[in-house]
Design a protein with these regions (language model features):
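N-terminal alpha-helical interaction blocks
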Residues: 2-158
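Activation/maturation switch segments at domain boundaries
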Residues: 1-53, 148-256
Length: 256
């Protein structure tokens, strides 16, 4: 008889919590780097700050990969599959990707002509406000880059492991509508072309599924699936918006 596994199983929840704990430590360390940026010397200090943050992304990304490898190996043992398998750790993100993300996060700190119509409201704010907003954006960018390494470690292992059949998305109760929609698809991902779609600040996890296992959506994911099918699926081109509204109306978007 096939053994059941779920997006809300104890191991999947612990893995999400471990990754969140890791990124909290990274954010703490990032905030200590803010002093590197000197408003009167942006051209010299912003690049230095980017270099320092990039080192943190490498450091914590390696930790995310290691956590995910341990998680995958434990799930493989729990599934009682045969044969040995060594989990390959995902590579660090390219330097260009990290730098582009951090440059985007800090784009509003640079001086602008307040009378220029192209200057946005965010760019007209006092420097301390602009720096605070840049820091929040940068933290979300770095968080995704770090956790992506862990998620890529699991999806990469599933693609290479002959005993793995698929992977599923594990979304928290407080996840956004986009993540909840993808989580309702269950264990349908296996191919090399099936990338894990994530946004800045995304804390979703990956659940590997092995031979002899049967994946089951959690109760809350089944409810998300019902809401999508009933309120959004028939409306082509407007499905995500309608799904978001349905989640909010039924108490599944606590952030709204």
């Amino acid at each position: 008889m096939a053994r059941a596994t779920s997006d809300a199983g104890p191991a999947a929840i612990r893995q999400r919590q471990a990754q969140r704990g890791l990124t909290r430590l990274m954010v703490r360390d990032m905030r200590s780097l803010r002093r590197i940026i000197i408003p009167s010397r942006l051209e010299a200090t912003v690049p230095a700050w980017i270099t320092a943050v990039r080192a943190l992304v490498d450091q914590y990304g390696a930790g995310s990969s290691a956590l995910s490898a341990d998680y995958y190996e434990a799930e493989r043992v729990a599934a009682r599959v045969t044969g040995s398998f060594s989990v390959p750790l995902a590579d660090s993100p390219p330097e260009e990707q990290v730098e582009n993300g951090l440059r985007w996060a800090t784009k509003d700190v640079w001086p602008r002509d307040p009378d220029d119509p192209a200057t946005t409201e965010a760019q007209r704010q006092p420097m301390d406000v602009r720096l605070e907003q840049a820091e929040k954006k940068a933290e979300a960018v770095a968080q995704k880059l770090v956790v992506d390494q862990g998620r890529d470690t699991v999806t990469g292992a599933v693609q290479r492991d002959r005993q793995a059949t698929a992977w599923a998305r594990s979304a928290a109760l407080g996840a956004c509508s986009f993540c909840k929609l993808l989580a309702t698809r269950g264990a349908v991902y296996k191919q090399d072309t099936a990338d894990f779609q994530a946004h800045d600040g995304c804390h979703c996890g990956v659940v590997p599924v092995f031979k002899g296992q049967r994946f089951e959506l959690s109760d809350h994911a089944r409810e998300w699936e019902r809401l999508y099918r009933e309120f959004a699926a028939p409306h082509s081109g407007d499905q995500l918006r309608r799904f978001r509204l349905a989640l909010a109306e039924h108490g599944h978007l606590p952030g709204l």
